[in-house]
From Swiss-Prot:
Matches recorded under HAMAP family: Enolase (MF_00318)
Stored PANTHER family: ENOLASE
Keyword field contains Ubl conjugation: no
Gene that this sequence comes from: eno
Protein name: Enolase
Length: 434
């Protein structure tokens, strides 16, 4: 017999994200008693195929970035339709919202409106059943803690400096538990501050908590990270590996089909891009590259996958935008070997879970990710454990909007106790082991 968890109230409001921009928060109440609350994140470098984040466009409020229309869509359009529905029927509720919107990219109601409701419904149901969210979504086998992909140095759109590539990250692949992994990252982060100071650089942090110093080249970040790993007492590659998100869609010029490294003053063809990555991977302990070529450069993706696809993780973010149609094309063409999962790129929990399932069936890894505009919401920490993804990307250990996710993962690891698994290098299950 199915438990009746009737949705009795739905309320949305405008709140602020970590960049001081408005975003949507939704509360869903079940049986007049159990509340689920979710806040929606927002990205800085967005893929052209992402679901649409509805903004008001009223320049007199928040420079046009208000979300009162999205809030109104929840309160006036979605709420009347889902009140009375059973919160356990997640797929049905998500599909109903997709139909109510009626567009391919959720531009009518806004992905920020739909996602807020979708996640709040799941949280309300979990609370009503007395289950942690990861267990409600993932069931009895949800036990894998993720390897953090921790952004500790920023360039590109996330920083005002001379580095074209957007994110330089560390992955504690040699740790034995999540708590140890987090400690290794934090220690390396603090050592990086010392390394940067010794070289005369500033140590202010960017949107995601990583340092954003005015480094001289695209390779210097890798040099200082290797030095920081060693100063923290770890072996680069064995204990802590490096991951990159160059966000090359931001560098790609569609007219000439080339990559313009404006800060470096170089233009590269797709062949030269692949060669650029191959050389860096040979020189540094890089285990993962996200968006190594642009979202529409399918030919470049094929070349990159042929060159490095068996050796390192190649993550599609702008390429796939958590979208099963885009992912299916990638699988068919044999490009990339991993997908970045961002809830707000697609806009419902159901579609997110479908994308993860499709990826896993094709032998692709899934990396659950934050956005650069975050809140104190920790849903992604529960999601990554729920689906046993094994990898999470949620910023540096230096801002509460990022640390909130790591702290939630510490709680989950403690709760799981002896059944918790930290995969380490096994998170890259589809690569040839050295």
């Amino acid at each position: 017999m199915k438990v009746d968890l009737s949705i009795t109230a739905v309320k949305a409001r405008e709140i602020l994200d970590s960049r001081g921009n408005p975003t949507v928060e939704v509360e869903v109440v079940v049986n007049d008693e159990f509340v689920g609350r979710a806040a929606v994140p927002s990205g800085a470098s967005t893929g052209m195929f992402e679901a649409v984040e509805l903004r008001d466009g009223d320049k007199k409020r928040y420079m046009g970035k208000g979300v009162l229309k999205a809030v109104e869509n929840v309160n006036e359009v979605i709420a009347p339709e889902i009140i009375g529905m059973n919160a356990l029927n997640q797929v049905e509720i998500d599909r109903l919202m997709i139909e109510l919107d009626g567009t391919e990219n959720k531009s009518k109601l806004g992905a920020n409106a739909i996602l807020g409701v979708s996640l709040a419904v799941a949280k309300a149901a979990a609370n009503a059943l007395g289950l942690p969210l990861y267990q409600y979504i993932g069931g009895v086998n949800a036990k894998y803690l993720p390897v953090p992909m921790m952004n500790i140095l920023n360039g590109g759109k996330h920083a005002d400096n001379s580095v074209d590539l957007q994110e330089f990250m560390i992955m504690p692949v040699g740790a034995k538990s999540f708590s140890e992994a987090l400690r290794m990252c934090a220690e390396t982060f603090h050592q990086l501050r010392n390394v940067l100071k010794a070289r005369g650089y500033n140590t202010t942090v960017g949107d995601e908590g990583g340092f954003a110093p005015n480094l001289k080249s695209n390779e210097e970040p890798l040099e200082v990270i290797v030095e920081a790993i060693e100063k923290a007492g770890y072996t680069p590659g064995k204990d802590i590996a490096i991951a990159l998100d160059p966000a090359t869609s931001e560098l790609y010029n569609e007219e000439d089909g080339k990559y313009h490294f404006e800060r470096e003053g170089k233009v590269r063809t797709k062949e030269e891009m692949v060669e650029f990555w191959v050389k860096l991977v040979e020189k540094y302990p890089i285990v993962s590259i996200e968006d190594g070529v642009a979202e529409e450069d399918w030919e470049g993706w094929k070349m990159l996958t042929e060159a490095l696809g068996k050796k390192i993780q190649l993550v599609g973010d702008d390429l796939f935008v958590t979208n099963t149609k885009r992912l299916a094309k990638g699988i068919e063409l044999g490009v990339a070997n991993s997908i970045l999962i961002k809830l707000n790129q697609i806009g419902t929990l159901t579609e997110t879970l479908e994308a993860i399932e499709m990826a896993n069936r094709a032998g692709y890894t899934a990396v659950v990710s934050h956005r650069s505009g975050e809140t104190e919401d920790t849903t992604i920490a529960d999601l990554v454990v729920a689906v046993n993804a094994g990898q999470i990307k949620t910023g540096a250990p230096s801002r509460t909007d990022r640390v909130a996710k790591y702290n939630q993962l510490l709680r989950i690891e403690e709760e799981l106790g002896s059944i918790a698994v930290y995969p380490g290098m096994n998170a890259f299950f589809n690569l040839k082991k050295k």
